[in-house]
């Protein structure tokens, strides 16, 4: 029986693809070598230890229906669209070796006519007249008996959108967590006009088979053709949850300030695991009572725009005469934390 396994996803759902990756990694025999090929529709994927409010323009992502997905590996934030090809190599130890998977990708690119080289810890670059340009970034995860290397290849990604979503608003965040390093990037279509996802997948597959001297049939997976993966439903539920994608952010503080016609407001939040652990308000409003009441309501709550807005509007019962102020405050807070 072959020790290789080849899976190709026809789903563009990042939560589905990352859940499949997680299940296969957890349950694969330690003797197996796996190649998983996939791609995501509009998504910002962040590293396991990153803060989405710090890394991403979360407001613009929500407006443009761009998903957030936290992966289980470390590293920085990346924007995925259908112009990216994603790959994952998995193997048991001691055979797991990220230099092997890197060489497979480099061999695939070479077969397509692109001369690339490894750079730093996790990038592949090509040399251009303007200098080195990144075409691939990777991240890694290891456990006691296995490891994986996953990454992306830029085929025809919309690089302008990359800048839109990975440049966060200038919020006053004093945050822990890993900050992404921005690199100069280029698309493979600049070097190979017309290159497709299918061609790149075929080249990586051939290089994978050539390295191990074996061939296997591809398993095509989708939400309708999920392979036999125990606990997949639970893994997908976790991967797609707010608690995982946002709530796992490292502790941070957020300062919001605004001046309204009725006074200036400064709100200080301390947030841990997506929950507000401390809320303070400072204001020169002639009627600060609603704001003081708000901080008490927010303590311990989720740091989510809809929840903050809900708590603001709940104060209308106790402070009906301040309806105008509370509605203005509600709209502002909801927009400021997205």
Swiss-Prot record:
Pfam families (UniProt xref): Lip_prot_lig_C (PF10437), LplA-B_cat (PF21948)
Protein keywords: ATP-binding, Cytoplasm, Ligase, Nucleotide-binding
UniProt lineage: Bacteria, Pseudomonadati, Pseudomonadota, Gammaproteobacteria, Enterobacterales
Oxidoreductase as UniProt keyword: no
EC nos: 6.3.1.20
GO MF term set: ATP binding; lipoate-protein ligase activity; lipoyltransferase activity
Something else known: In the transfer reaction, the free carboxyl group of lipoic acid is attached via an amide linkage to the epsilon-amino group of a specific lysine residue of lipoyl domains of lipoate-dependent enzymes.
Cellular localization per UniProt: Cytoplasm
Native species: Escherichia coli (strain 55989 / EAEC)
Sequence positions that bind (R)-lipoate: 134
Binding site for ATP: 71, 76-79, 134
Any GO BP: protein modification process
Catalytic function, reaction form: L-lysyl-[lipoyl-carrier protein] + (R)-lipoate + ATP = N(6)-[(R)-lipoyl]-L-lysyl-[lipoyl-carrier protein] + AMP + diphosphate + H(+)
Subunit structure, interactors included: Monomer.
Domain BPL/LPL catalytic: 29-216
Assigned protein family: Belongs to the LplA family.
Gene: lplA
Cited function: Catalyzes both the ATP-dependent activation of exogenously supplied lipoate to lipoyl-AMP and the transfer of the activated lipoyl onto the lipoyl domains of lipoate-dependent enzymes.
UniProt-recorded name of the protein: Lipoate-protein ligase A
Enzyme class: ligase
């Amino acid at each position: 029986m072959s020790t290789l396994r080849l899976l190709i996803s026809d789903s563009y759902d990042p939560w589905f693809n990352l859940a499949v990756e997680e299940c296969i990694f957890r349950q694969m025999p330690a003797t197996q070598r796996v190649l998983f090929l996939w791609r995501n529709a509009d998504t910002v994927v962040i590293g396991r230890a990153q803060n989405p409010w710090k890394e991403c323009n979360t407001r613009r992502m929500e407006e443009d229906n761009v998903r957030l997905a936290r992966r289980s590996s470390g590293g920085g934030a990346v924007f995925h669209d259908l112009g990216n090809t994603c790959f994952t190599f998995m193997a048991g130890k001691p055979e797991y070796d990220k230099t092997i998977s890197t060489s497979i990708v480099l061999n695939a690119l070479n077969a397509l006519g692109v001369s690339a080289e490894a750079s730093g810890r996790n990038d592949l670059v090509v040399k251009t007249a303007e200098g080195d340009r990144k075409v691939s970034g990777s991240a890694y995860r290891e456990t006691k008996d296995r490891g994986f290397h996953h990454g992306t290849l830029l085929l025809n990604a919309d690089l302008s959108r990359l800048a839109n979503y990975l440049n966060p608003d200038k919020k006053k965040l004093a945050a822990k967590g890993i900050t992404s390093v921005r690199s100069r990037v280029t698309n493979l279509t600049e070097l190979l006009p017309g290159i497709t996802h299918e061609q790149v997948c075929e080249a990586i597959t051939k290089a994978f088979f050539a390295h191990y001297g074996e061939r296997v049939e591809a398993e095509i997976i989708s939400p309708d053709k999920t392979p036999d993966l125990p606990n997949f439903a639970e893994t997908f539920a976790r991967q797609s949850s707010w608690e995982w994608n946002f709530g796992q952010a490292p502790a941070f503080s957020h300062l919001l300030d605004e001046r309204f016609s009725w006074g200036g407001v400064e709100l200080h939040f301390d947030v841990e695991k997506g929950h507000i652990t401390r809320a303070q308000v400072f204001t020169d409003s002639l009627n600060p009572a609603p704001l003081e009441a708000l901080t008490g309501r927010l303590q311990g709550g989720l740091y989510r725009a809809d929840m903050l807005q809900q708590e603001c509007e709940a104060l209308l019962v106790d402070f009906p005469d301040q309806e105008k102020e509370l509605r203005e405050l509600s709209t502002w807070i909801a927009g400021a934390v997205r």
